[in-house]
Amino acid sequence: MKNKLIIFSHHYVDDIVIERFNNLKKLNPTWDVIPIGFDGYNLLDGSLILDKSKYPNNQGLVYFVPKYHVNWFEPDLFTYEGYYQKPDYDEYFLYEYDTICNVSIEEFFNTNVDFFGSTICNPGAETWDWVKLYRKHNPYNTRFKKIYSYGQSTCIYFKKEILKQCVEEVIKNKYFYDNMLSEIRAGTLVSQFTSLKKGREDINNFISWTPDDINVNLNQPHFYHPVK
């Protein structure tokens, strides 16, 4: 076993997903790479299956944004479950199936930190719809004077000591984090134990929510998201 783990999140299998999984392993020989997914989906062999029962529930968000399945609101759970099932690594990196790369993690990102995300909101605006939904539909919302976001749930890096504290907190006090979109739930968790950081200053040129926000140049070193 290596001392670093890449958690490869996905919800279906086709030739492209298989190629991206294998490419990730090839580019990062010093990391173990393990796939993970929600129960009930066609997943890669050897995948960890996420047990959602011990975590917060975002079902309430579905009533207000019904075009999405509840799992769409909860990809941060993959990181927590990766640690929960595989707690003996020193470093963890969450990588979503619709991300592409052509270099190793260390070649592209600064891993000399205890955490990094992408589109950091430090803190998020109270007028943001996801913050407003949380404030309205979770009676424990006043526990958090400010709400933070770590960005998209891909290319997220944790040192063990930070992820361990996040997992312990989100399980112990899971009802505090119900109806909280993954980006703001994870960001608010992380903010309790360290500062929110980026893996590189120009990361928003590479990682976004929609393809229209990024200019894909395959000839330069990259981690791009989303690329379907």
Where are these regions (language model features)?
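Short, well-formed alpha-helical segments that are part of the catalytic scaffolds
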Residues: 13-27
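Short beta-strand-to-loop acidic/aromatic patch adjacent to the donor-nucleotide binding site
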Residues: 89-100
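Conserved catalytic core of nucleotide-sugar-dependent glycosyltransferases
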Residues: 100-183
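C-terminal catalytic/acceptor-binding lobe
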Residues: 171-228
